[in-house]
Curated annotation (Swiss-Prot):
GO molecular function, one term: potassium channel regulator activity
Similarity comment text for this entry: Belongs to the O2 superfamily. Contryphan family.
Keyword terms, alphabetized: Amidation, Calcium-activated potassium channel impairing toxin, D-amino acid, Disulfide bond, Ion channel impairing toxin, Neurotoxin, Potassium channel impairing toxin, Secreted, Toxin, Voltage-gated potassium channel impairing toxin
Domain notes: The cysteine framework is C-C.
Domain of life: Eukaryota
Cystine bridges: 3-9
Further remark: Exists in two forms, due to cis-trans isomerization at 3-Cys-Pro-4. The cis isomer is the most abundant and is thus thought to be the functionally relevant conformer.
Keyword Transmembrane helix on entry: no
Protein name: Contryphan-Vn
Amino acid sequence: GDCPWKPWC
């Protein structure tokens, strides 16, 4: 998923 590097996740 994107959450580890996308601050708006």
